[in-house]
Amino acid sequence: MLLVAHPASYRTASFIGAGERLGVRTVVASNSCLGLSPTGRPGVEIDFSDPQIAVERIRQFHARDPISAVLGVEDASLEIAASVAQALSLKSNKPQAIQDARLKHQCRKILATAGLLSPTYRVLEPEEMINSEWVGECEFPCVVKPVSLSGSRGVIRADHVNELSAAIVRVQHILKRENPHLDRRILIEEFIEGHEY
């Protein structure tokens, strides 16, 4: 099994351990030689910023050492893992399905098209963030979140205009720190009262 993982992922060792307990040989594909073999295993060095080249590198590895399954171990590796599985004709979710689920604004569009309820929202393009004309259209409280991060990273409630402006700036900084290749758009959506699970 091929695990596609960033070198800083805390999940990789758990997946390798689970594979060992099940008798499954694991190989790690990562964007750093340091993260390739936490247990001395061979690995495949890939560039997460260029998925096409990453898929080709893994395809070349597969030609020498066949892979029977591919698994992305965190949100940022799921699309590459799905693309690899598709290229190698392995079972997996389709890359477009992964992207639609990961990118919050795309997921909201799909839910609306299907007639399912979801919060009202607005997508801010990076160039819109410095222009405050749209702020008058916002209802408070609202929630600010990056379209591309998971695990509640960058999700901030804003109760008034000043908090909204500060939240947008904070999310921009989080996105820059996380990965320079991430989608920079920000979602501003209706706040829905209730328990978060």
Where would I find each of the regions flagged by the language model?
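ATP-binding N-terminal substructure of ATP-dependent carboxylate-amine bond-forming enzymes
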Residues: 1-97, 128-130
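Fold-independent oxyanion-binding glycine-rich loops
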Residues: 5-7, 30-32, 146-147, 160, ...
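Short coil/turn connectors at secondary-structure junctions
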Residues: 22-24, 138-140, 153, 182-183
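Hydrophobic alpha-helical packing elements
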Residues: 53-57, 107, 167
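A conserved helix-loop-beta module that forms one wall/lid of the active-site cleft
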Residues: 86-154, 161
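A short beta-strand signature within small-molecule sensing/ligand-binding domains used
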Residues: 196-197
